[in-house]
């Protein structure tokens, strides 16, 4: 994704000249009042200030963001409100004439925005060919800054201003406009009040179009160059990391325009994610089902580019070999390693590397059910591993009868939620392959959940509704525009080998979470960690994520949106259900007496086929 850096100036005499000045100073978009030259606030002005022909149609759409007249369509005064609405609708009509798919920016003045919301709702319906509406919101209530200069402010006044949170202004409008993908938020920073970390984190879960940085936020460094203070650098960096564009707001006579643009372009370069998988951000994907579907070579290739995972598997096998075979037995004792699912060979390489590093003798059995993967593995046996004691079997591990039992059983059957690729069922079925004192790598997996706010993910779920029951699915997603309402907590645990007399892989658990700030619940995040051997672990739990590992994206279980209040406790109940043909999850927010929708009953949406 390419970012834009926008120059915002009011009171300009010429939009083409503003564009020329902006582009000469390394900006690629401009923002200014739709009423350049200060058109009087008369709804039926007969003398327009500029014609449509001063720019081409493509330039109107790609280079200009219009700010609407600063009128209050929600004024408590009837006459002022009606007059404001006429002016506002005149501006909207002019903008639609100039920009059939352009961008309009309107400022929220306070919590009362019902009329504005109804206008935006009408203009953003699916059958209406409009562009985007950018809702400009201060990151904190501007009223709070005034108390720093007032000695007469009472505690009640301060508390009231703190409770009048601009996020709620935005949220109320967003709810009325039904989470429209055409309605995005533009967050205005201010030099009078720096937001808390939790405030910033919450905004990251919103569909952010841009942040506005006023020129007053810049300071001169020792080289007399315009920069942001360290605290603001960090805040701006967080927004850049979720693809927020930058709008620099200045007065028309500012002489440091180029310095501002160059500086924020450097911030963008320093903070944007250049990872090879960033094109998957916020995409919803149906989880793989490798037990019943054969993976293609592209999928294998993506997994194999993760060096961290296979290095940790190698470390685990290495440690197990050292524990299993003493130095005195190294040249004589053979360790049988059984690999459940060979893919294109990365785990086999990890086993051979571990054997070489420990100087232990191994015999490797590779059990792989994918006939296409077998072809690649067979070629590797002939060309790369001709000197190895390795044997390939084209079998389902649950139906395989081994020539001998394994000392170490290695598998890579974990999904984004730990057990969602049916590792318990697979490893239970493969238990007969392992010696009574054999080692399973991994030997334990734990799933985790937490409540999430993500307007972008919710919008993506809603776009799938016409085709299938999208709120009854769990998705794999590279979570980007999210707010963690509370930290993840452990859900289900599975231990291997499971030698219980009656194995039951169904589960049910209720987990409670605290709401730290007013927000909206859009769904449930799902993660896992696994212990490979002893203290060697892999994790995608945000609290303990294995550095540099990207083989697994988290899961996202959708819910209907609900506004939550600071201090509230919510409980989430999760089920893992099993029948003769499938495994599935069900989930529900259980806040008595107002239990929310029960999702994926009987696995009618997302399920894993046995």
Curated annotation (Swiss-Prot):
> Where does the SAM-dependent MTase PRMT-type domain start and stop, copy by copy?
284-587
| Family annotation (InterPro entries) | Arg_MeTrfase (IPR025799), Arg_MeTrfase_PRMT5 (IPR007857), PRMT5 (IPR035075), PRMT5_C (IPR035248), PRMT5_TIM (IPR035247), SAM-dependent_MTases_sf (IPR029063)
Q: In which tissues is it expressed?
A: Expressed only in ovaries.
Enzyme Commission no: 2.1.1.-
**Binding positions for a protein?**
303, 412, 421
Which sites bind S-adenosyl-L-methionine? Answer: 300, 309-310, 368, 396-397
| GO biological process: one example | intracellular mRNA localization
Q: Its Gene Ontology molecular function terms? A: histone arginine N-methyltransferase activity; protein methyltransferase activity; protein-arginine N-methyltransferase activity; protein-arginine omega-N symmetric methyltransferase activity
Extract the Pfam families matched here. PRMT5, PRMT5_C, PRMT5_TIM
The knockout note for this entry states: Flies are viable and do not display neuromuscular dysfunctions. Strong synthetic lethal phenotype in the presence of a hypomorphic Smn mutation.
Taxonomic superkingdom? Eukaryota
Q: Where is this region: Interaction with vls?
A: 470-610
Q: Which residues form the active site?
A: 412, 421
What biological function has been recorded for the protein in this entry?
Arginine methyltransferase that can both catalyze the formation of omega-N monomethylarginine (MMA) and symmetrical dimethylarginine (sDMA). Specifically mediates the symmetrical dimethylation of arginine residues in the small nuclear ribonucleoproteins SmD1 and SmD3. Required for arginine symmetrical dimethylation of piwi family proteins, piwi, aub and AGO3, during germline development. Required during oogenesis for pole cell formation in the pathway controlled by oskar (osk) and for abdominal segments during early embryogenesis. Involved in nanos (nos) and germ cell mRNAs localization.
UniProt similarity note = Belongs to the class I-like SAM-binding methyltransferase superfamily. Protein arginine N-methyltransferase family.
Oligomeric and partner information: Interacts with vls.
Q: What is the protein name for this chain?
A: Protein arginine N-methyltransferase 5
- Organism this protein belongs to: Drosophila melanogaster (Fruit fly)
